[in-house]
């Protein structure tokens, strides 16, 4: 399952658990909230990488100009450093396709 289109359907509850255990230490997912070590993910879908106001992004993140959506997040979350070399995110990624799909399902709801 190398693409989001081939991934299993995401589960919102499992995605929330993944967010709380693997993402929440560095990110919040609420529109209008502040940033932590990583940027606030509120309004993530449709946003271009490196553009959340008030966060000091890496040059790589700003220059990548990735528009975040299901497919781009699915690829990015597999291996963030490989997808966007030079970005600040220290997270190694989610290797299981179902975990990436679950997290994306949660993020779609939580960041809207």
Swiss-Prot record:
MF term (GO), any: heme binding
UniProt keyword Metal-binding, yes or no: yes
Gene3D superfamilies linked: Cytochrome c-like domain (1.10.760.10)
Residue positions binding heme c: 23, 26-27, 89
Native organism: Chlamydomonas reinhardtii (Chlamydomonas smithii)
InterPro entries: Cyt_c-like_dom, Cyt_c-like_dom_sf, Cyt_c_1A/1B
Role summary: Electron carrier protein. The oxidized form of the cytochrome c heme group can accept an electron from the heme group of the cytochrome c1 subunit of cytochrome reductase. Cytochrome c then transfers this electron to the cytochrome oxidase complex, the final protein carrier in the mitochondrial electron-transport chain.
The protein, known as: Cytochrome c
Subcellular location: Mitochondrion intermembrane space
Broad class of the protein's primary localization: mitochondrion
Signal peptide annotation: none
